[in-house]
From Swiss-Prot:
UniProt-recorded name of the protein: Putative GDP-L-fucose synthase 2
GO BP term (any one): 'de novo' GDP-L-fucose biosynthetic process
Keywords from the named record: Acetylation, Isomerase, Multifunctional enzyme, NADP, Oxidoreductase
Residue numbers binding substrate: 203, 218, 225, 285
GN (gene name): GER2
InterPro entries per the UniProt record, alphabetical: Epimerase_deHydtase (IPR001509), GDP_fucose/colitose_synth (IPR028614), NAD(P)-bd_dom_sf (IPR036291)
Active-site annotation: 152
Length: 328
């Protein structure tokens, strides 16, 4: 039987096409904005960007006419409806429905209008709740998902499978990357619904500004987590667009584990909070360990460059200039 998984597809031409038209969907988000910065830094001059008000990705007819008119050569799909546990529990229909609509519209129109290559970005939440650690790509669909974000996860799994199906049926070069926990400029620092790293940064900053004696953090601080600076992810995306044309999705992680306690101490140091750090052990810890196995990407020749300490310092500078100063 012939190999129709597309593993024989040519790679290495993306970096040579600096004037090719590239559509980055979701360019205002944490991930999309970093990809745009990286592409511009690398000398790409023909980026097509649309805000939500200019192009509603959930509208099939709008997406279809956009592709018919603009005819991008490459597509990076970083647009998604995202949110924390509370949002996922409150709006499950939105999390599965909106993400399925965006993916279906963009992937199908990209294929029908002759896009040369598409990169779909997912999330580490696609993996089973009790996946082996570190989590290899092969763990996908081997067990039940974490119930708190299964609606979002199922949509993302469908996106991976859609790319694979179009590759199998149409020999079309659609690839998928699965990032670990991300942080960096343009992150969400909202007090109610931000992730652990920006939430800690905001709390330490506010405690410092208010001369507070202590900051109380939920749990014991023992869970292990992995963090990747979003600029490293953007670098990996450009690398994958240029160097990877395989059937299987690719994990994109830092490979470095840190306890929540170590993370909190590091953020405290970067922010310059001199008070005490108190752990409320009556509160839950969450999953004890979550680490992606990114050895496949490393074997292709890509590794991250930004250390957690440097990344946190950059992120705090951005937070001061773009969140704190704008409130004043």
């Amino acid at each position: 039987m012939a190999d129709n998984t597309g593993s024989e597809m040519k790679s290495g031409s993306f970096m040579l096409e600096k004037s090719a038209k590239i559509f980055v969907a979701g360019h205002r988000g944490l991930v999309g904005s970093a990809i745009v910065r990286k592409l511009q830094d690398q000398g790409f001059t023909n980026l097509v960007l649309r805000t939500h008000s200019e192009l509603d990705l959930t509208s099939q007819s709008d997406v279809e006419s956009f592709f018919a008119t603009e005819k991008p050569v490459y597509v990076i799909l970083a647009a998604a409806k995202v949110g924390g546990i509370h949002a996922n529990n409150t709006y499950p229909a939105d999390f599965i429905g909106v993400n399925l609509q965006i993916q279906t519209n963009v992937i199908h129109s990209a294929y029908t209008h002759g896009v040369k290559k598409l990169l779909f970005l997912g999330s580490s939440c696609i993996y089973p709740k009790f996946a082996p650690q570190p989590i290899p790509e092969s763990a996908l669909l081997t067990g039940p998902l974490e119930p708190t974000n299964e609606w979002y996860a199922i949509a993302k799994i469908a996106g991976i499978k859609m790319c694979q199906a179009y590759r199998l049926q149409h020999q079309w070069d659609a690839i998928s990357g699965m990032p670990t926990n991300l942080y960096g400029q343009n992150d969400n620092f909202h007090p109610e619904n931000s992730h652990v790293l920006p939430a800690l940064m905001r709390r330490f900053h506010e405690a410092k500004a208010n001369n507070a004696d202590e900051v109380v953090v939920w749990g014991s601080g023992s869970p292990l987590r992995e963090f990747l600076h979003v600029d490293d992810l953007a670098d990996a995306c450009v690398f994958l667009m240029d160097q990877y044309s395989g059937f299987e999705h690719v994990n994109v992680g830092s490979g470095v584990e840190v306890t929540i306690k170590e993370l909190a101490e590091l953020v405290k140091e970067v922010v310059g909070f001199k008070g005490k750090l108190v752990w409320d052990t009556t509160k839950p810890d969450g999953t004890p360990r979550k680490l992606m196995d990114s050895s496949k990407l490393a074997s292709l020749g890509w590794t991250p460059k930004i250390s957690l300490k440097d990344g946190l310092s950059q992120t705090y500078e951005w937070y001061l200039e773009n969140v704190v100063q704008k409130k004043q």
